[in-house]
């Protein structure tokens, strides 16, 4: 039997792609990605103030899929426009709070820290993603790392957003703390940047750690997966809920490297509190411990619930 097709709509960021692809895989859908771009003026307008039309898109496509999975602000208009045109021929799922009427979607998948509620809303702990433990372990030999009999610490660096600005001072504080805690006589570090990591922060990390440790200077998915496989301990900067959620598939200790927020980060505080209660994360401080927790695999927990909704709508 042919797999049901899904069209994945995002703005092309790693965190969004990870979520839509992870969900489509859990639902056993064949899929293709489409990066959404709105025409110049409309890309700056919030969805709730935007009229719904496919004419706002810089590029249209023929929708030959029964399922639309979207994530991110700019994809909202496209998903709703397709739903208006194709009606019950498609099942549209949006990941994250769309900031518009929930009635525009058949289903919304939203993290608990967003505080969204509705009959067509299913909530998750943290962000859903595409990572699987067996896929991570397959990449363990991708990085040629001499552990030298030491504990391996993977340090995953995010980048600035509206809550964290990655100022030189804050970056220095984090890097100095990591150097002080994870001394080279006991630990071997793998430092991994993300798509959002500024070039100057990557250079600073290289200068700070490359003498004794392995610093990956370019974004490399295989290196990222290998680093998760090799790690005894994982450190993730506090700016990325997606990367912390991805790391939680490993069941390995996750330390969050905190920095000062530039504005009230209520959603982040809720998320950190929730993951601490689940025993997944701890703040990066002076003491280093090893611990384990139950694997967090939200996307596969949700899959049967979503399939039931799709059956009710006659999609499967």
Question: Which role does the model predict for each range below?
Answer:
Residues 2-7:
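Extreme N-terminal starter segment of soluble prokaryotic enzymes
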Residues 272-316:
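Leloir-type glycosyltransferase catalytic cores
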Residues 186-220:
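Catalytic donor nucleotide-activated moiety binding site of glycosyltransferases and closely related
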Residues 102-167, 284, 290-296, 300:
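A nucleotide-sugar donor-handling region in carbohydrate enzymes
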Residues 11-13, 224-265:
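A donor-sugar binding/catalytic signature common to diverse glycosyltransferases
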Residues 19-24, 81-83, 107, 201-210, ...:
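Short, aromatic/basic amphipathic alpha-helical patches
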